[in-house]
């Protein structure tokens, strides 16, 4: 059908594929004709935001992507960094937000499966998983259902496939009601002599389909992930994939065995957009074409048409390009593992994706048109910050009631500082996530150094590897964290995003790890709305600056936009802008690490970093005063670098016995968490002169960057304080000493006026049981 003939589709049919009228006109121009149904579907998924980043690509160009340890940056299935000693780490973060909103168990489970495939497709064995989760208020029954389902899905897939879930974060806020965020990060250690890339090459080389069969599950998942959610989204359950973790375990082993033969030229996971994405991306990256015969594809359902084959997102499937003549060698490996493996196509010289079905051409599209030369929207940025931000920035702590050493009066009732601390510890965002991580197998593979909740970052031991005829013994480990304070980013996307990077690096430094590199997951609302695009643009600017300042290049990641829920009136309610940073760090000696809990009674407690904090954007302000306003703390990167380096070097010198980032809830919450992690009390004296410069609640619960709480053996006090004076000047404070197991957390002024005295038992009850109580378990 020529380009001048009438379109064979109605505007509604075109819109149903996620294609705008002007995009359809561009498709017709490029093809020189109208597309058929299968081709329209292919363009719909490949031109979705989920696949082509048409609104975010110009912003992502700001990110630093190179560095001395970066082996593979953005553009491949996962980033790879050099750990030294012949060890290489692959890592990546991805989202499965929309599927988890309509089918939480399978949505979250297949999110785990998809990110694991990104890792082992590179030739790396998965060694760890982390997750970053966001939900609405835990008092809401719908949130409880989503939360329970997501956690069950993550634990089911990860536990069955045998990869430990070693860390993560969980936030609860009404901003995520109906639109949860499920971001999953995976790490893998390279096992193959060469990193496996995804660009096809070698004209005449066979194209192999391996793994599971193809069905109708996950139809149009990429387009589904690029639209707002509504009450009718439950009807989109067919767009949610169904995973098989036991099959994935076999796929891991078969792929790694196949890669080691040297018979594989390129490999690509069939994730979003399934066969369409894998064929077009492999062809475009290699500057070649791929011809694929759908009649060769193993199916689990009868009567499938090309549109369904091409858009199916059935899980646990891969596409390989093999060296000609060695295809049977690979097929035998997959059959031995009980998996499908067939030659389904060929690499061709013409740079097109040609799909055959029942002896005829079902689709024929230039590969670049699908995977590289896709639409790009450079939107106009607001000339000034939006009104909601300007109003929030006008807030001042002067509007809060007056503080005294006894507490603060809220709505006519005096609340003591002790009561406020217990309330914060009982807040689901701050409280222990033991209800979550007890469902995860976090020790499978026997390389997990810290149990979840025991340190500010996960630490994984690097076991001796057999490769290329030698055994590599090492004391090295990797640390990993996922972080984002979305309230900070909502109130000031630029400063908030910088703070995300700083906190991730700080968490790694608290376990003694040198921050190396970043993978990011950008979760935002609609970029087509001026406020949404302003938030996205400013956050990307902040992330880029933070990564440059802390020398942590970005190796890749994921963009998830249109995270909005339509209310009953049809008005879109966007989530908080949530740029999650996954960061990895290197530990050269696993005997030189520490957790967040106090270790020994009599150890001296110090606060490294700035003493001045703010209540703007704080957990205290949101929880106790029900106010989301103010500006988040501004990041001082010079101080951040110095504080983090002092912490790392203190750990390496065996001076620092515990280290904990002061984050949500401020200093006193950090003190309480260190008491609970070590099951030891503490006696703290806060300088009363500080309260002349700051409100008392700012001193206790204010938040700020570059602040780390550490404990040091009393025998090392003189050496440590000399070191602090040399490297931090006045930017540190001695706070007090660690108590016994039966001691309280006692916070006093320097003239011994009591501010807080609370037992470990009482804190423990609020902190450990907050989530279970709300779930009525």
From Swiss-Prot:
Pfam families to which the protein is assigned, alphabetical: AIRS, AIRS_C, FGAR-AT_linker
GO molecular function per UniProt: ATP binding; magnesium ion binding; phosphoribosylformylglycinamidine synthase activity
Catalytic activity: N(2)-formyl-N(1)-(5-phospho-beta-D-ribosyl)glycinamide + L-glutamine + ATP + H2O = 2-formamido-N(1)-(5-O-phospho-beta-D-ribosyl)acetamidine + L-glutamate + ADP + phosphate + H(+)
Protein family: Belongs to the FGAMS family.
Primary localisation category: cytoplasm
Pathway: Purine metabolism; IMP biosynthesis via de novo pathway; 5-amino-1-(5-phospho-D-ribosyl)imidazole from N(2)-formyl-N(1)-(5-phospho-D-ribosyl)glycinamide: step 1/2
Residues that hold ATP according to the record: 53, 92, 520, 557
CDD domains: PurL_repeat1, PurL_repeat2
Active site, UniProt feature: 50, 96 (proton acceptor)
Role description: Part of the phosphoribosylformylglycinamidine synthase complex involved in the purines biosynthetic pathway. Catalyzes the ATP-dependent conversion of formylglycinamide ribonucleotide (FGAR) and glutamine to yield formylglycinamidine ribonucleotide (FGAM) and glutamate. The FGAM synthase complex is composed of three subunits. PurQ produces an ammonia molecule by converting glutamine to glutamate. PurL transfers the ammonia molecule to FGAR to form FGAM in an ATP-dependent manner.
An example Gene Ontology biological process: 'de novo' IMP biosynthetic process
Localization per record: Cytoplasm
GO cellular component: cytoplasm
Residue numbers binding Mg(2+) 1: 94, 558
Organism of provenance: Trichormus variabilis (strain ATCC 29413 / PCC 7937) (Anabaena variabilis)
Subunit structure: Monomer. Part of the FGAM synthase complex composed of 1 PurL, 1 PurQ and 2 PurS subunits.
Identification of the protein by name: Phosphoribosylformylglycinamidine synthase subunit PurL
């Amino acid at each position: 059908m020529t380009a001048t003939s009438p379109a064979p589709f109605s505007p509604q049919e075109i819109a149903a594929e996620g294609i705008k009228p002007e995009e359809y006109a561009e498709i017709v121009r490029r093809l020189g004709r109208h597309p058929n149904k299968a081709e329209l579907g292919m363009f719909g998924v490949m031109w979705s935001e989920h696949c082509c980043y048409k609104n975010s690509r110009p912003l992502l160009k700001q990110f630093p992507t190179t560095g001395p340890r970066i082996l593979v940056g953005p553009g491949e299935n996962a980033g790879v960094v050099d750990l030294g000693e012949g060890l290489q780490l692959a890592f990546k973060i991805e989202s499965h937000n929309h599927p988890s909103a309509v089918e939480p168990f399978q949505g979250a489970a297949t999110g785990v499966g998809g990110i694991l495939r990104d890792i082992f497709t590179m030739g790396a064995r998965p060694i760890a998983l982390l997750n970053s989760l966001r939900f609405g208020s835990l008092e809401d029954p719908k949130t409880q259902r989503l939360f329970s389902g997501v956690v069950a899905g993550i634990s089911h897939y990860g536990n069955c496939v045998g990869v430990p879930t070693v860390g993560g974060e969980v936030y609860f806020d009404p901003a995520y009601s109906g639109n949860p965020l499920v971001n999953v990060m995976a790490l893998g250690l390279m096992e193959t002599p060469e990193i496996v890339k995804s660009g096809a090459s070698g004209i005449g080389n066979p194209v192999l389909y391996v793994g599971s069969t193809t069905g109708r599950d996950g139809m149009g998942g990429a387009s589904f992930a690029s639209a707002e959610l509504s009450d009718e989204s439950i009807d989109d359950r067919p767009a949610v994939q169904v995973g098989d973790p036991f099959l994935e375990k076999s796929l891991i082993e078969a792929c790694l065995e196949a890669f080691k033969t040297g018979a594989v030229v390129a490999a690509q996971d069939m994730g979003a957009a399934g066969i369409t994405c894998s064929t077009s991306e492999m062809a475009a990256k290699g500057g070649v074409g791929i011809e694929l015969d759908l009649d060769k594809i193993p199916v689990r359902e009868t009567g499938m048409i090309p549109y369904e084959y091409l858009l199916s997102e059935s899980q646990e499937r891969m596409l390989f390009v093999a060296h000609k003549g060695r295809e049977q060698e690979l097929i035998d490996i997959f059959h031995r593992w009980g998996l499908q493996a067939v030659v389904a196509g060929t690499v061709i010289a013409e740079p097109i994706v040609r799909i055959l079905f029942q002896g005829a051409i079902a689709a024929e599209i230039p590969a670049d048109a699908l995977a590289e030369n896709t639409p790009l929207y450079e939107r106009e940025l607001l000339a000034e910050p939006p009104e909601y931000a300007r109003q929030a920035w006008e807030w001042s702590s002067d509007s809060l009631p007056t503080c005294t050493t006894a507490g603060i009066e809220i709505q006519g009732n005096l609340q003591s500082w002790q009561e406020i601390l217990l309330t914060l510890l009982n807040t689901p965002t701050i409280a222990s996530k033991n209800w979550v991580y007890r469902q995860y197998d976090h020790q499978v593979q026997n390389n997990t150094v810290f149990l979840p909740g025991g340190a500010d970052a996960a630490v994984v031991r690097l076991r001796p590897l057999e490769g290329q005829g030698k055994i590599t013994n090492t004391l090295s480990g990797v640390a990993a964290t996922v972080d984002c304070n979305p309230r900070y980013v909502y109130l000031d996307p630029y400063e908030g995003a910088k703070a995300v990077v700083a906190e991730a690096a700080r968490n790694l430094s608290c376990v003694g790890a040198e921050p190396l590199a970043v993978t990011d997951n950008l979760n935002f609302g609609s970029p087509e709305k001026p406020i949404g695009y302003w938030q996205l643009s400013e956050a990307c600017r902040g992330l880029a600056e933070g990564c440059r300042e802390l020398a942590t290049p970005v190796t890749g990641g994921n963009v998830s936009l249109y995270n909005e829920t339509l209310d009953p009136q049809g008005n879109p309610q966007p989530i908080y802008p949530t740029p999650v940073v996954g960061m990895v760090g290197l530990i050269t000696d696993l005997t030189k690490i520490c957790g967040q809990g106090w270790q020994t009674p009599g150890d001296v407690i110090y606060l490294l970093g700035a003493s001045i904090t703010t209540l703007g954007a704080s957990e205290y302000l949101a929880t106790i005063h029900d106010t989301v306003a103010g500006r988040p703390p501004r990041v001082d990167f010079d101080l951040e670098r110095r504080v983090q380096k002092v912490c790392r070097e203190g750990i390496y010198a065996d001076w620092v016995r515990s280290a904990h980032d002061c984050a949500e809830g401020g200093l006193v919450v950090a003190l309480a968490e260190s008491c609970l992690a070590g099951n030891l009390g503490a006696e703290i004296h806060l300088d009363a002169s500080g309260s002349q410069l700051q409100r008392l609640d700012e001193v206790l619960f204010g938040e700020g960057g570059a602040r780390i709480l550490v404990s040091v053996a009393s025998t090392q006090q003189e050496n440590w304080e000399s070191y602090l004076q040399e490297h931090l000047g006045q930017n540190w404070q001695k706070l007090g000493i660690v108590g016994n197991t039966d001691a309280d957390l006692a916070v006093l002024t320097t003239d011994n006026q009591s501010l807080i005295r609370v037992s470990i038992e009482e804190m423990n009850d609020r902190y450990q049981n907050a989530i279970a109580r709300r779930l009525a378990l």
